[in-house]
Amino acid sequence: MILLIDAGNTRIKWGVIRGEAWIAEGALIHAEVAALGDIVAAHPGLRRVVGTNVAGADIAAAIAAALRGVGSAPQWIHASAERCGVRNRYDNPAQLGADRWVALIGARALHRAACLVVNAGTATTVDVLAASGDFDGGIILPGEDLMRRALAGNTAQLPFAEGRYVGAPRNTADAIVSGCRNAQAGAIERMFRQIAHLPGARCLLSGGAAPQLEELLGIPFSRVDNLVLKGLAVVAREDAAA
């Protein structure tokens, strides 16, 4: 069995696979990282850990400490020029975030036509993946929660809003929430224009904020939970077969 780890800015997502089968999956906040040891204890057949980490060196060290029971150090995946049928056309391929890279690999395995790969969380990433497997570039913007916090922290009279989304807001809280959410959806739809004319073009939408965006998108899309974990599974299986 293999333990997959997606250490993000807010949460640590995990999954356990055996061959093609998913055995278990879940998520922890950073403060609960030691509980990864319980996952190891519950799955005594674990032999490898494969993961991505964008949360920094301290979290990486805490994860490694919690997973000592596996018997081998975590294999952290980093972006490269090519892997699992995806070619990285970033100006400096190694600079691409590991989570974005692995999400692209997961998307390639799920959808062979042109696609827009969206991961909506603390930050929102929107990446263009060609039918050829070429990653043609993408954008990063603050997630909805960060946008709301930026308004609250950098203006004198705007609070951290707990409003709701409406088409034409008539109060400040709703105006902030609706504006931030429209900004997310608008960025996604604008990026989709680059591939909208291509056969089978589709958006793959993942991340903790995906549910809030679904009702706003006027483009073909599929909701894919834990796309980074799915990409890690592709990487782990390819390595095992090599």
UniProtKB/Swiss-Prot annotation:
> Which residues act catalytically here?
99 (proton acceptor)
Q: Where substrate is bound, by residue?
A: 90, 97-100, 172
Gene that encodes the chain: coaX
Q: Which organism is it from?
A: Aromatoleum aromaticum (strain DSM 19018 / LMG 30748 / EbN1) (Azoarcus sp. (strain EbN1))
Note the subunit structure.
Homodimer.
**Which is one GO molecular function term here?**
ATP binding
Cofactor note (record): A monovalent cation. Ammonium or potassium.
Q: What PANTHER family does the record point to? A: TYPE III PANTOTHENATE KINASE
* Listed pathway(s): Cofactor biosynthesis; coenzyme A biosynthesis; CoA from (R)-pantothenate: step 1/5
> Which is one Gene Ontology cellular component term of this protein?
cytoplasm
Binding annotation for ATP: 6-13, 122
Cofactor names? NH4(+); K(+)
Task: State whether keyword Kinase applies.
Answer: yes
Reaction(s) catalysed (UniProt annotation): (R)-pantothenate + ATP = (R)-4'-phosphopantothenate + ADP + H(+)
Q: Which CDD domains match?
A: ASKHA_NBD_PanK-III
Its annotated function is as follows: Catalyzes the phosphorylation of pantothenate (Pan), the first step in CoA biosynthesis.
Q: What is its EC number?
A: 2.7.1.33
Q: What is its main location?
A: cytoplasm
- Keywords for this entry? ATP-binding, Coenzyme A biosynthesis, Cytoplasm, Kinase, Nucleotide-binding, Potassium, Transferase
- Provide the top EC class: transferase
Q: Provide one Gene Ontology biological process annotation.
A: coenzyme A biosynthetic process
- Would you tell me the protein name for this molecule? Type III pantothenate kinase
Question: Where does the record place it?
Answer: Cytoplasm
Q: Which family is this sequence assigned to?
A: Belongs to the type III pantothenate kinase family.
